[in-house]
Regions:
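Catalytic-domain carbohydrate-binding cleft regions of carbohydrate-active enzymes
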Residues: 1-271
Length: 271
């Protein structure tokens, strides 16, 4: 169960308690972009005011039958806490020129740099960021993005033209390995993919439109994905964004019900 987005432990607990009281089957609660100090500012740390006791918060949810998944991405923002360390140690690939951005948060170009998974020290640094979260009880990391990188940058082990497609594989491998090391279960919640990513399940379609066309596209994409060797795949039910208002239009009951029926036949279902 997810939404865009939960902003506090109290909000999450209220939703989770209500699902149990109404006998709604759910075993994973996913926190998207709002669990940081600032929404979308990925620093791999809980907001201390809105989530004052992360370990206690997660333990309470586990006692209630929920595992916790957290959103993050493989880029470091200019105003992130880790930016100085990341730049000084080349954990993010140095840019050869400044790139234009529209400030949308939806592209690598909206961030100061891409974590360089061709550089073993950067990979271990990234794993350390995730380990701190897994150690307090987080079960799964959402490896969002990864489908594009900064192309005007110098990566330690590969030219960006070669790395661009392979990046998702290296990114998900790192998250999968540290998750399995800490929790014993190898799992991520990934969006991008390339040949070999089936070794690091699972993947979901990501951000489709809440419409009949959006549902049809998710079905067609998922069928092709399965034929490409991916045993596990999922999608947002009933889509992610709406029309004409991107986040605030009402999804029709017919689309909601039919998409739920479709979702039950995929390996994992995400509301």
């Amino acid at each position: 169960m997810s939404r865009m987005t939960y902003f506090s432990a109290d909000e999450v607990n209220e939703i989770c308690d209500r699902m149990r009281s109404e006998h709604y089957p759910c075993d994973v609660i996913h926190l998207d972009t709002g669990w940081f100090r600032t929404d979308w500012l990925c620093e791999w740390k809980f907001n201390e005011e809105r989530f004052p006791d992360p370990k206690g918060f997660i333990q309470r949810l586990k006692k209630n039958g929920y595992r916790v998944s957290l959103w993050q991405l493989p880029y470091v923002a200019e105003n992130a806490e880790q930016i100085g360390e990341a730049k000084a140690n080349d954990y993010i690939a140095p840019l050869t020129r400044q790139q234009d951005t529209d400030g949308s948060n939806f592209s690598a170009l909206d961030y100061a740099g891409t974590i360089d998974f061709t550089y073993p020290k950067a990979t271990e640094w990234y794993k350390g960021l995730l380990k701190q979260l897994l150690d307090v009880g987080v079960t799964c990391i959402k490896t969002d993005f990864g489908e594009n990188i900064h192309m005007d940058a110098v990566y330690k082990g590969m030219k960006p033209e070669l790395l661009n497609n392979l990046y998702a594989l290296l990114y998900q491998k790192a998250a999968y390995e540290i998750t399995k090391e800490v929790t014993g279960d190898g799992i991520v919640w990934a969006r991008a993919a390339w040949a070999g990513c089936q070794r690091y399940p699972l993947h979901w379609g990501g951000d489709s439109c809440s419409s009949w066309d959006g549902m049809a596209g998710s079905l067609k994409g998922g069928l092709h994905f399965g034929l490409s060797g991916f045993a596990f795949w999922s999608h947002d039910v009933p889509g992610f964004h709406t029309l004409p208002n991107f986040m605030n239009s009402i999804v029709s009951d017919d689309v909601y019900m039919r998409w739920t029926q479709f979702g039950l036949f995929t390996s994992h279902i995400l509301y």
